[in-house]
From Swiss-Prot:
The modification Citrulline is found at R3, R9, R18, R27. The gene is H3-5. The modification ADP-ribosylserine is found at S11, S29. The modification N6-(2-hydroxyisobutyryl)lysine is found at K5, K10, K15, K19, K24, K28, K56, K64, K122. The modification N6-acetyllysine is found at K5, K10, K15, K19, K24, K28, K56, K115, K122. Transmembrane segments: none annotated. Keywords: Acetylation, ADP-ribosylation, Chromosome, Citrullination, DNA-binding, Hydroxylation, Methylation, Nucleosome core, Nucleus, Phosphoprotein, Ubl conjugation. It comes from Homo sapiens. The modification N6-methyllysine is found at K5, K10, K19, K24, K28, K37, K56, K64, K122. This is Histone H3.3C.
Length: 135
C-alpha cells in the first residue's frame, strides 16, 4: 500500500464531549455562584478601532482648559502679566496637536524600522534628530 502525504488542516471542533452524568451530578450538588464572564476583545482590537476613529475625526484631542492652564503656566516664566485671546490659545493648541501627531507618526516609523511595534523614548529621540530639531 502506497504512503500518502498528510496535509495540515484547521481543526473545526473543540474539546471532546464529556460524560453527561458527572456534570449533571456536579451541577445539582453545588449552587451556581459564578456568572458568565463578560465579553472581552482580543488584545489590540480596541486599539485599532480607536486609531481608525481618531484618524477619521478632526476635533482636538487635548482638553481645552488643561491646555490653557499649561500655556499660562509656561508663559508666566517669561512675563507675569500676559493675557491671551481665546483664538490665540486655540491656534497654539491646533499647532501643538499637529506637531505631536506628526512626531508620533515619525516615531512609529522608527519603531517599525527597528522591527518593533512598541514605540520607545529612543524612537522619539531618533525622529527628532532626523528632523533636525535636536542635535
Amino acid at each position: 500500500m502506497a504512503r500518502t502525504k498528510q496535509t495540515a488542516r484547521k481543526s473545526t471542533g473543540g474539546k471532546a464531549p464529556r460524560k453527561q452524568l458527572a456534570t449533571k451530578a456536579a451541577r445539582k450538588s453545588t449552587p451556581s455562584t459564578c456568572g458568565v464572564k463578560p465579553h472581552r476583545y482580543r488584545p489590540g482590537t480596541v486599539a485599532l478601532r480607536e486609531i481608525r476613529r481618531y484618524q477619521k475625526s478632526t476635533e482636538l484631542l487635548i482638553r481645552k482648559l488643561p491646555f490653557q492652564r499649561l500655556v499660562r503656566e509656561i508663559a508666566q516664566d517669561f512675563n507675569t502679566d500676559l493675557r491671551f485671546q481665546s483664538a490665540a490659545v486655540g491656534a497654539l493648541q491646533e499647532a501643538s496637536e499637529a506637531y505631536l501627531v506628526g512626531l508620533l507618526e515619525d516615531t512609529n516609523l522608527c519603531a517599525i524600522h527597528a522591527k518593533r511595534v512598541t514605540i520607545m523614548p529612543k524612537d522619539i529621540q531618533l525622529a527628532r534628530r532626523i528632523r533636525g530639531e535636536r542635535a
